[in-house]
Amino acid sequence: MASEQTIDGAAAIPSGGGDEPFLGLLDVALLAVLIGGAAFYFLRSRKKEEEPTRSYSIQPTTVCTTSASDNSFIKKLKASGRSLVVFYGSQTGTGEEFAGRLAKEGIRYRLKGMVADPEECDMEELLQLKDIDNSLAVFCLATYGEGDPTDNAMEFYEWITSGDVDLSGLNYAVFGLGNKTYEHYNKVAIYVDKRLEELGANRVFELGLGDDDANIEDDFITWKDRFWPAVCDHFGIEGGGEEVLIRQYRLLEQPDVQPDRIYTGEIARLHSIQNQRPPFDAKNPFLAPIKVNRELHKGGGRSCMHIELSIEGSKMRYDAGDHVAMFPVNDKSLVEKLGQLCNADLDTVFSLINTDTDSSKKHPFPCPTTYRTALTHYLEITAIPRTHILKELAEYCTDEKEKELLRSMASISPEGKEKYQSWIQDACRNIVHILEDIKSCRPPIDHVCELLPRLQPRYYSISSSAKLHPTDVHVTAVLVEYKTPTGRINKGVATTYLKNKQPQGSEEVKVPVFIRKSQFRLPTKPETPIIMVGPGTGLAPFRGFIQERQFLRDEGKTVGESILYFGCRKRSEDYIYESELEEWVKKGTLNLKAAFSRDQGKKVYVQHLLEQDADLIWNVIGENKGHFYICGDAKNMAVDVRNILVKILSTKGNMSEADAVQYIKKMEAQKRYSADVWS
């Protein structure tokens, strides 16, 4: 994007009082030259670049994220002869990926498709979709947070919830993306599927539910491979044709692009790294200097970092309980290895261009750029590849046995699924590992870049209070590193990146960040008592809570009791923020309950301490209407804690188990029960 330039054209007013012309002849001449020069520059900059002859691939589907000025998906469908539109609600990219795969497969069934972001479309046009022959709307919708729609599906969700439109004649299907460890499993997809039927729409195929805690990829391919026959039967279409390799983007190598026009890691705006300007968000992150990066663990072989980021001058604001998102970069050695395996010159400047000229999503990531930049900043190279990637990689195998192995793992056969589970998932193989082990598979690097998902920001609970640290954000992060069954050492992308970001003297070390607001909040009345359950790094948001309550006490305000249940392995190894916690206890701000699971013969966890303190917990949440918070592991700890709370409410509150469950749901509705958990 060329920077805008302005010319100060204010003329000096003559000091005399006569009726002289506002602009003299010389002024007019100079102005004409300036205007002419500006017009020449503008027209020249708008000229299309000449494209080298190296470009290839075809694509019958489009990713259509229409602009605000052209948000009619109906017009696009009609203009391009399409009848299938796949909407997605996605927070991390998986929903969008599934939508793209469905639209791409539609060509096999004579249904030309496009992918659409509901946030960028006029969703009231769903009423008109029935006017297109054999039309079908598919919704791939993730449930996010506390049973909420994703950011980009929020307006559609509100519209379908509050509206009372007649959707008779609309053919639809829904696939949901959720996680069974969370209470509101696939709530959004379940509701939308039911609501569309209530509004008169025709369900072409049953609701599909994907569980990210198990194998969402298997859930999706099992659903879609039953979905397509149902669609064919509904529309009277013959079965699918032969599967062919279809490329969505064509390669354009651009060796002559000026260096200042090449993306070097910017998320959206070119030169946004060098020229920072607010507001800062997911598309325009702030480069935050790291002020402190220190180790919290005292021993034990594991690492936990305390990081302090400066947000001074960013105009970003946060509250205790919010999240900070960081954009990591991939390990240089992995990037180099992938380049070698694909026989690529990583410093080649290129663009991947959508073959559908009607699509407003011209590139899968910022282009033009280099392969090195794309693999470092834009693509997820350490993730476990999904089956559709294996299917396309198989076409580049020269060894038939290796080709068959990849094809088998991409199939829906029981043997193929079992092989995918053991060889890919259990072995934690990423794209680099696969190409290392499948030695005859050497795909072109541009196709690899097309196939890999976008590198997503990593979210961390902020472990500080803006009352005490208004221009700093604190982060508490455990370094992820483990040995796989193949003997390789896998490392977490973000924590490895952060571990190496050590401030050195006067030289600033920066990371791109933005703030994400949360519903995880302290009570509006400081005198309200609270219970916090946060083992390990689950302590992070509660450190911010306690800082804030200490700050209020120091100001002379009345603050309710703050009870923290914290757990770790050993007091001598991973008791993080020990001195701070002990100091708050001494000052009377904190009532600390600590469980050290491996400091005695029988393991003790926070769950055990909660059971022992049944009277205290009932007093806080039952008799004094206090707030209850959980932060940490969703799959085990959070479930156990909730079950214990149900038991305490039943015994101490004289409730049935069903009433106790309803009591917790009522607390959730009142924002008195909050969870910040992950799996």
UniProtKB/Swiss-Prot annotation:
Ranges for domain FAD-binding FR-type: 283-523
Record-level Gene Ontology MF annotations: flavin adenine dinucleotide binding; FMN binding; NADP binding; NADPH-hemoprotein reductase activity
Statement: the UniProt record of this protein carries the keyword Oxidoreductase: yes
Binding site for FMN: 90-95, 142-145, 177-186, 212
Source organism of this protein record: Drosophila melanogaster (Fruit fly)
Tissue: High in antennae.
Cellular compartments annotated: Endoplasmic reticulum membrane
Gene3D superfamilies (alphabetical): 3.40.50.360, NADPH-cytochrome p450 Reductase, Chain A, domain 3, Nucleotide-binding domain of ferredoxin-NADP reductase (FNR) module, Translation factors
InterPro entries xrefs: CysJ-like_FAD-binding (IPR003097), FAD-bd_FR_type (IPR017927), Flavdoxin-like (IPR001094), Flavodoxin/NO_synth (IPR008254), Flavoprot_Pyr_Nucl_cyt_Rdtase (IPR001709), Flavoprotein-like_sf (IPR029039), FNR_nucleotide-bd (IPR039261), NADPH_Cyt_P450_Rdtase_alpha (IPR023173)
Cofactor: FAD; FMN
Protein name as annotated: NADPH--cytochrome P450 reductase
